[in-house]
C-alpha cells in the first residue's frame, strides 16, 4: 500500500461562460480544496495560475479552506492545431529562466502574510539562475 506525504492539487479552469464571475470560479476552487482537505489526513498544496485577480486574497482564502501550501505557478500546456489535418498536436514547452522573476515576486509578496508554505516551480535551470 502506498502512503502519500502530501497532495498537490494541480487545477485548471477555463472561463468560457460570460455569466460566470471570477468570484464564482474562485469559490469552486475553494470548495474543492475544502472537500479534499476534509477527506484526507495529509497536507494539501494547491498549484495556482498567475492570472488570479487578487492572489494574496485568494491564498488567504485557500488557507482558510484548509490548504497547507501553494505552488507558484502552474504552466499550462498549449497544444497546437494542424489546419491541414484538423488534428490537435501536443506540444511541450519547457520553462525559461525569465519565468522565475514573477514567481519570486509573488513569493516575496506572500511571505509573512500567510501561514502556509509557498513553493515556486519553473524558471530555475542552474544554481546561477537564483
Spans of model-derived segments:
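Alpha/beta enzyme core
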Residues: 1-121, 125-130
Amino acid at each position: 500500500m502506498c502512503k502519500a506525504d502530501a497532495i498537490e492539487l494541480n487545477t485548471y479552469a477555463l472561463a468560457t461562460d460570460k455569466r460566470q464571475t471570477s468570484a464564482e470560479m474562485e469559490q469552486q476552487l475553494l470548495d474543492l480544496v475544502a472537500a479534499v482537505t476534509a477527506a484526507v489526513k495529509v497536507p494539501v498544496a494547491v498549484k495556482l495560475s498567475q492570472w488570479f485577480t487578487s492572489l494574496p486574497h485568494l491564498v488567504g482564502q485557500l488557507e482558510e479552506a484548509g490548504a497547507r501550501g501553494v505552488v507558484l505557478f502552474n504552466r499550462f500546456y498549449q497544444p497546437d492545431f494542424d489546419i491541414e489535418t484538423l488534428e490537435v498536436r501536443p506540444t511541450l514547452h519547457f520553462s525559461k529562466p525569465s519565468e522565475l522573476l514573477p514567481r519570486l515576486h509573488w513569493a516575496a509578496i506572500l511571505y509573512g502574510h500567510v501561514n502556509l508554505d509557498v513553493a515556486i516551480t519553473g524558471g530555475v535551470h542552474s544554481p546561477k539562475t537564483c
